[in-house]
Each structure stands twice: as structure tokens, then as C-alpha cells.
């Protein structure tokens, strides 16, 4: 039985880690694109599914990070938690990493993070569809997507250097604008 080879775009140098270039798999999304749906694994040892389409009808800030157990991802996810608490109920927050669900649950409990986190470890296609899967380590590259109520991308940022945090102000402004209109 012949296996079909997966075909997708490779983007050498799309991400860096302390200057070392990394290759992203998948196309970059663009503002106006329909956000790809995906089923991710929620927190816990037997994780419940989390779907991007579950957020239709709400504005979603989707944060992709390599691992919650790294200093930059830790700071970023805690910051998104602070921002989420100040936002209205029409804006949801989802952080996706490649961490196992029970590791996410442990980290979130220790960090007092209550917004939804999910893992793409069982579905690397999510990383390809969003253009954030790094070929060299199979982790997600840092990125932020603001998705409106209709599932369209209103703002995105692919953060090239993985030790750099995203532009929170730009993402928050886009989320507030999407929620208002």
C-alpha cells in the first residue's frame, strides 16, 4: 500500500530562536481569511476536545506558543490572562501549545490561569493550517490571531524571534474593534 506524501508550503527562516533560523510548515494566513477549524486537546489526562469553531459568535484571541514551560511563553500566557480578565465577555482567549494536556493543567493551576488552553500535540495539522508548526522541533511558533464572530481573521502576528513577546496592544485593539462592530 503506497502512502501519500503530505504537501504543504515550507517557509525557511519564518521563525528564529536566539538567531537560529527555523522553518515553518504551512502557508501564512492573512487578514480576511476564514480561520481554519481544528480539534485540539483540552487540559487533563483525558482531555476534552476544544474546537476553533466552538468560538463562532464570539471574538477570539488565539495565542500560539511553543511551550508553557518556557520563560517567554510563561510571561505571555500570564499577560493574556491579565488582559482577558479586563476584557468584556464578548472576547474569548485560547492559548494553544504542544504541551500535553495534563502538563497544561499543572502549569495553569500553578500560574492561576483560568482561560482555555489546548494542545495541538495530537493534531499537528493545526500548526500547518495556521502556518506555525516548526519543522525542526515540531513545536508551534509564537503567533497571535484575532478571529471575529464570523470566523474571519481580523488581526494576526507571526512573531519571528521566539524569545520575543507579541504586540499585545495591536491584538487587543483589533479584538475590541471586532467586538464593537
Name every feature range the model reports, one short phrase each.
Residues 1-181:
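Chalcogenol-based redox active-site neighborhoods
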Amino acid at each position: 500500500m503506497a502512502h501519500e506524501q503530505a504537501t504543504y508550503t515550507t517557509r525557511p527562516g519564518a521563525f528564529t530562536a536566539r538567531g537560529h533560523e527555523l522553518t515553518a510548515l504551512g502557508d501564512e494566513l492573512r487578514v480576511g481569511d476564514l480561520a481554519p477549524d481544528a480539534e485540539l486537546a483540552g487540559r487533563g489526562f483525558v482531555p476534552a476536545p476544544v474546537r476553533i469553531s466552538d468560538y463562532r459568535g464570539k471574538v477570539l484571541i488565539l495565542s500560539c506558543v511553543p511551550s508553557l514551560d518556557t520563560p517567554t511563553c510563561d510571561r505571555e500566557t500570564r499577560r493574556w490572562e491579565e488582559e482577558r480578565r479586563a476584557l468584556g465577555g464578548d472576547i474569548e482567549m485560547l492559548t494553544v501549545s504542544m504541551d500535553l494536556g495534563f502538563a497544561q493543567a499543572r502549569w495553569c493551576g500553578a500560574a492561576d490561569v483560568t482561560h482555555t488552553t489546548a494542545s495541538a500535540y495530537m493534531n499537528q495539522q493545526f500548526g500547518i493550517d495556521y502556518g506555525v508548526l516548526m519543522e525542526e522541533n515540531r513545536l508551534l511558533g509564537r503567533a497571535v490571531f484575532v478571529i471575529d464572530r464570523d470566523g474571519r481573521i481580523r488581526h494576526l502576528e507571526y512573531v519571528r524571534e521566539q524569545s520575543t513577546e507579541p504586540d499585545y496592544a495591536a491584538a487587543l485593539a483589533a479584538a475590541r474593534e471586532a467586538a464593537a462592530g
